[in-house]
Amino acid sequence: MSTGKIIQVIGAVIDVEFARDNTPKVYDALNVVEAGLVLEVQQQIGDGVVRTIAMGSSDGLRRGMEVKNTNAPISVPVGHGTLGRIMNVLGEPIDEAGPIEYTEKRSIHQAPPAYDELALSTEILETGIKVVDLICPFAKGGKVGLFGGAGVGKTVTMMELINNIAKEHSGYSVFAGVGERTREGNDFYYEMKDSNVLDKVSLVYGQMNEPPGNRLRVALSGLTIAEGFRDEKRDVLMFIDNIYRYTLAGTEVSALLGRMPSAVGYQPTLAAEMGALQERITSTKTGSITSVQAVYVPADDLTDPSPATTFSHLDATIVLSRQIAELGIYPAVDPLDSTSRQLDPLVVGQEHYETARAVQKVLQRYKELKDIIAILGMDELSDEDKKIVDRARKIQRFLSQPFHVAEVFTGNPGKFVSLKDTVASFKAIVNGEYDHLPEQAFYMVGSIQEAIEKAKTL
């Protein structure tokens, strides 16, 4: 184990000098013995000097401190010992419940599975959320992105998905909290504990207060644990909140390392870094990883390089819209912007496909008519268009749904709606079977039966 000494400290970037014939490799983990800090080598500058990024706070470091090379990348424990535990980027427990028992540690830097090992699945995962099951269904082993600006409900929607899928799903789940609020991580831990599924979940947190090196690597640590379960021939759920913070940490690290910024100030290696993470989140012939990733959209601009780079890696995209949230319709999913590769008659069946497209057609026509209504009013529309507007407003309200995880805020008990009921209900609304019910009856209900009951009280 070779030793070196710190020669420069610039915030999270630390230069360390080693003997020239003992220069550490890129991605090697170094230990600052006195401070108990781990550094990761990012660049070899020459003459035995390496530029590293700190995995924790660099407060209190000074030049001349001794640094040991571990001769290996950062490694985290994998396997059953990680279940029910909260870990940091280094795989160390941060829940004060004693050490983690493990038989294997894996490097967080792994090559993605080879092309011939990949496996595709068209099995649909039922989420119990009407708008998701109808418009952008999930595939088992697929990748789903939740896109949305600040405060439109990404984390709540993700928590509901975790609640509905992880509780129904008998396999294991891994949750990586990347640069998000510590409070949300805390809430999530107790939510899992109260619902007795904590023993099936591994939690890896690197929250907002951590330095950029930590936030850049914590997604990889979580993914390594998920890969460990996948290689044990299991089906794993992987939740990442938030992918944007991973990109942002990469931007900060890139600037600290002195690289030339590219569009909008992002790192020049944005696509490569995103690819390195996303290509590993995949299903092989041994097991599957189904991932749900929250993606923050800066200033509600979906063309921003970060969300735009993420789009290309996903099978399904759920776009949350501020306009829909302003109407008080939650989950604020935009049914015209959200897409799924699984919405195909060969996968979901002809009836589901035609119903989803009919719903989108009605909503699209309503969107086109809005300008006419704003200028001339409803009276100028033809009878056919009046019917379409009426149905579209009912569909819009029926796409809302009370969530289990939001029960404490709204007082409405959460609802899980089966896919069969969802398709049948929307088909009936589009066909005009419920034209006699007032539109208020469709707001914040689960099944169509509830809407019928609610109409009687209005």
Swiss-Prot record:
EC number: 7.1.2.2
Source organism (scientific name): Francisella tularensis subsp. novicida (strain U112)
UniProt name for this protein: ATP synthase subunit beta
NCBIfam families, alphabetized: atpD
Gene Ontology cellular-component terms listed: plasma membrane; proton-transporting ATP synthase complex
Keywords in alphabetical order: ATP synthesis, ATP-binding, Cell inner membrane, Cell membrane, CF(1), Hydrogen ion transport, Ion transport, Membrane, Nucleotide-binding, Translocase, Transport
Extent of the signal sequence: none
Gene of this entry: atpD
InterPro entries linked: AAA+_ATPase, ATP-synt_VA_C, ATP_synth_F1_bsu, ATPase_a/bsu_AS, ATPase_alpha/beta_chains, ATPase_F1/V1/A1_a/bsu_N, ATPase_F1/V1/A1_a/bsu_N_sf, ATPase_F1/V1/A1_a/bsu_nucl-bd
PANTHER family to which the protein is assigned, alphabetical: ATP SYNTHASE, ATP SYNTHASE SUBUNIT BETA, MITOCHONDRIAL
Record GO terms (molecular function): ATP binding; ATP hydrolysis activity; proton-transporting ATP synthase activity, rotational mechanism
Subcellular location, principal: membrane
Enzyme class, UniProt record, top EC level: translocase
Localization annotation: Cell inner membrane
Gene3D superfamilies: 2.40.10.170, Bovine Mitochondrial F1-atpase, Atp Synthase Beta Chain, Chain D, domain 3 (1.10.1140.10), P-loop containing nucleotide triphosphate hydrolases (3.40.50.300)
Summary of the function given for this chain in its UniProt record: Produces ATP from ADP in the presence of a proton gradient across the membrane. The catalytic sites are hosted primarily by the beta subunits.
Any single Pfam family the record assigns to this protein: ATP-synt_ab
Binding residues annotated for ATP, in chain numbering: G148, G149, A150, G151, V152, G153, K154, T155
Topology of the protein relative to the lipid bilayer: Peripheral membrane protein
Superkingdom of the organism of origin: Bacteria
Reactions the enzyme catalyzes: ATP + H2O + 4 H(+)(in) = ADP + phosphate + 5 H(+)(out)
